[in-house]
Amino acid sequence: MKSNIHPKYEEITVTCSCGNVFKTRSTANRDLHIDLCSECHPFYTGKQRAVSAAGQVEKFRKRYGGGQ
């Protein structure tokens, strides 16, 4: 096997726009700044926007003229 062919795997700091900071390991040689993390993403926080199915149907009917 060849030696010294794998990239260095180092600890980096990841900073989210919400202020959450955590450490992880990566081959990236610099710290990361991200927009969303598990602390602020709607899927993980449970603050998802519920889409009204009735509103979507009315929008479809208005756009394509289908009405009953």
Curated annotation (Swiss-Prot):
Binds 1 zinc ion per subunit. One of its GO terms (biological process) is translation. It comes from the Bacteria. One of its GO terms (cellular component) is ribosome. Belongs to the bacterial ribosomal protein bL31 family. Type A subfamily. HAMAP family: Ribosomal_bL31_1 (MF_00501). PANTHER family: 50S RIBOSOMAL PROTEIN L31, CHLOROPLASTIC, LARGE RIBOSOMAL SUBUNIT PROTEIN BL31A. This is Large ribosomal subunit protein bL31. It comes from Acidithiobacillus ferrooxidans (strain ATCC 23270 / DSM 14882 / CIP 104768 / NCIMB 8455).
